[in-house]
Design a protein with these regions (language model features):
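Feature for intrinsically disordered/low-complexity regulatory segments and propeptides
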Residues: 1-115
Length: 116
């Protein structure tokens, strides 16, 4: 039998996550992706170009949603992410500016978990 979390542990995990989650409704012109090492980080800015939060890591689900939103084929997006993150950042940032929209950025504990 596979063991998992107890009811108490699950409740604690849910409570912890509810305290650490944040959702932001942002214009894509207020977003910027920046490569750092093998990761991409999302920077968020307010209307005065001041950072809203610390740079955020982007999880795999959010990467897929960003690529889908920008109409970048998944295989090409993944190749840029692994082989040439600077090119991916340039592409994403350019499309964010060129075709601005309001998007919800869902975060949990310093990581973008959804781009809706």
């Amino acid at each position: 039998m596979k063991s998992g979390l107890t009811i108490v542990e699950m409740a604690q995990q849910i409570e912890r996550q509810s305290k650490l989650k944040q959702d932001y409704l942002l214009d894509t012109r207020r977003l910027q992706v920046e490569p750092f090492g093998s990761q991409l980080y999302l920077h968020t800015f307010d209307d005065h170009d001041d950072p809203l939060v610390e740079p955020l890591e982007i999880n795999q689900i959010a990467h897929r949603q960003i690529g889908t939103h920008l109409k970048i084929p998944a295989a090409y997006y993944d190749r840029m992410l692994s082989d040439y993150p600077e090119l991916l950042a340039e592409n994403v940032n350019s499309w964010f500016q060129r075709e601005p929209t309001q998007r919800m950025v869902r975060t949990l504990d310093g990581t973008v978990r959804a781009f809706l």
